[in-house]
Amino acid sequence: MNLIYLIYNRPDCVEQSLPVILEACPKQVYLVADGPKSGNEEDARKCERARQRALDMLDGVCEVHTDFAEENRGCARRVSSGITQAFEVFDDAIILEDDCVP
């Protein structure tokens, strides 16, 4: 199974959802993250923590591809562009956001 996992600035959601997702033993994960809002240091810290937490949890578990935006693109544009990029790598995938606990 291939997974496209969409995250933003919620490390707590990553910590809740990713362990459950990993029980399904994904072969590859394409990690898509929007960037922090301009000038918002707290948002930048949360984005970085969410990214790092996801990477730490995925390390050694499966093949990981990353697509991390440097600046905030907004939900609609970031989700669309991230999924488009992921399907350049994957033929098929399950798509989940960090706040979806299967």
Question: Over which residues does each language-model region extend?
Answer:
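N-proximal low-complexity "stem/linker" segments adjacent to membrane-targeting elements
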Residues: 1-23
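Structural beta-sheet core signal
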Residues: 3-5, 31, 95
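Well-ordered alpha-helical segments embedded in enzymatic catalytic cores
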Residues: 13-16, 78-82
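Acidic donor-binding segment of Leloir-type glycosyltransferases
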Residues: 22-67
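A short, glycine-/small-residue-rich helix N-cap motif at loop->alpha-helix starts
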Residues: 70-78
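Active-site nucleotide-sugar/metal-binding loop of Leloir-type enzymes
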Residues: 80-92
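Short beta-strand-to-loop acidic/aromatic patch adjacent to the donor-nucleotide binding site
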Residues: 90-101
